Design a protein with these regions (language model features):
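Extracellular, repeat-based ectodomains that mediate carbohydrate processing or recognition
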Residues: 1-242
């Protein structure tokens, strides 16, 4: 598998259940991937049962780069899955969409991202499901940016969104980021990130109407300013399920 400098030094694989079928999707970064060389691999385990049989290792077509730091998320209402990765060979962002049967890819969505480093996680994915529309969400670390840099996806079509400028400002170097979807109100999610100043931030994203997406500074201030480390998942979050 792909690594930064030594084995097991970065989150280079992820697994999800399809929400309707219960099929398993395992995606990882193959070590042969590089800048301009497809490094994404996947296997599925159909059936939604503990005794399911894993299919063959498959290389999804059109993916273009290594996938050193990656994340996938399942749509809570369908069999769709969203994928995002940044490679450490070239710092390129690639975005993927699984429709329940096949992967499609948007390569080089951003070619100047922060290069993944040991124990970092510089990309996060999620879904927003509203009354009349659904969007996938990808947040990533753009090079030298203190803003929240993000894409939304409508099925397999990804659109770069205007940067959200957080208050207070977040340091330009990120350590670890994650997205958590609200299991009750599926039209909102929380994005959390640590930065190089040992700060922790939480921001909320809400989908309203047909396609209105609104970020809020739900933390108001840094939740923590003295994290003991900024890498290797230095925080945890969960919605209270009523």
């Amino acid at each position: 598998v792909r690594r930064c400098s030594s084995s097991h030094d970065i989150e280079n694989m992820d697994i999800e259940y399809e929400s309707l079928s219960g099929d398993l999707m395992l995606v990882w970064a193959n070590g042969t991937g590089s800048n301009g060389t497809n490094g994404v691999r996947y296997r599925t385990c159909p059936g939604g049962i503990p005794t399911c049989t894993w299919g063959a290792v498959t290389t999804p077509p059109t993916f273009l780069d290594d996938a050193t730091s990656l994340d996938i998320s399942a749509n809570p209402s369908t069999d769709e899955i969203v994928f995002a990765s940044i490679g450490n060979a070239g710092g390129d962002l690639q975005l993927g969409y699984w429709n329940g049967s096949i992967w499609t890819d948007t390569a080089n969505a951003d070619t100047s991202c922060t290069v993944p480093y040991t124990a970092s996680k510089l990309v996060a994915t999620g879904w927003l499901v509203g009354a009349s529309s659904t969007r996938s969400v990808v947040v990533y670390s753009d090079l030298n940016s203190g803003n929240i840099n993000w894409y939304t996806g409508n099925a397999g079509v990804f659109t770069r969104q205007p940067d959200f400028v957080p208050t207070p400002a977040i340091a330009t170097s990120r350590g670890y980021m994650d997205i958590h979807m609200d299991p009750v109100d599926k039209a909102q999610l929380m994005y959390l990130t640590s930065d190089s100043l040992s700060d922790l931030y939480a921001k909320r994203l809400v989908l309203s109407g047909t396609s209105t997406l609104t970020w809020t500074n739900s933390d108001g201030v840094a939740l923590e300013t003295t994290l003991p480390q900024v890498i290797s998942s230095p925080f945890s979050f969960a919605f209270w399920k009523k």
